[in-house]
């Protein structure tokens, strides 16, 4: 069985090889979201923002506004809690087409403690205009969503 994360990165890398407008943005989470191969093979299409989720969302919005197809990736807890204002204003209200890949929602990062738990991500994001939330159950659904 193929994990959803592997399906995501395999599909994204395959598409990005053919489309230079596809950009992956992350926040010191290339290992968590399995973007190491993407970063090595397509460094010109990869942006590492460090531990700066607000900046990653803002950069992603700017890239999308310029016509790029942006996937911003990292732990779900940080894109909902730490950068909520940027997601609301820079993505939702501004209608910038950025895909947020939030990994390890809920308490999946149990060992890292409450700072890494994301119990409210779906509840909060569904209130924003134009925000679509999907939770693929397997590699096949993940691949279709990325495509």
What are these regions (language model features)?
Residues 1-147:
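Thiamine diphosphate
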